[in-house]
């Protein structure tokens, strides 16, 4: 069973990832969920997937967290992304947070030897060489999950199935 931390779980890509987990519970277990501010949606996800850690990057007082979701560790602020990316034992970290915050999350995950599933182009635009060097150092490629990024990634591979995607020079 693969464990996954989902940073940005209440957004479009995060909810799609959770749908895959829902369809394949024997293959995946969610260990961390984070969101920016969609707390009600995050509370619902925590109830269903029962992660070890949950967090909001826009902090709220613990008194505003419902009793029935306090079974997991709650982390607030930027620390939520770091804890979910690097502290919680996870095989994979899906980084689907918006903007430059994604770069630090990617670097934290790679620093903890995690497989990064990337849905944040800003991380590569602003720190591409840092990200790719870190991925190379741990021997794990960055796997794009956004549709456009994934299409480009697939076309740059030597082979997909039996068909070659690019000419060899």
Regions found by a protein language model. Name each.
Residues 55-57, 73-80:
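Short acidic-hydrophobic, aromatic-tinged amphipathic segments that line or gate anion-handling sites
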Residues 10, 46, 93, 113, ...:
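Residue-level signal for inorganic ion chemistry
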Residues 2, 50-52, 70-72, 112-115, ...:
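A short helix->loop->beta-strand "cap" motif at the edges of active sites that frequently abuts
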Residues 16-23, 44-45, 126-139, 155-158:
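Active-site-proximal loop->helix
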Residues 76-109:
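Beta-loop-alpha module in the N-terminal Rossmann-like domain of NAD(P)-dependent dehydrogenases
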Residues 159-169:
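Residue-level detector of conserved catalytic or cofactor/ligand-binding positions
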Residues 1-54:
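N-terminal Rossmann-like dinucleotide-binding module
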Residues 65, 100-112, 121-141:
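Rossmann-fold NAD(P)-binding glycine/threonine-rich loop
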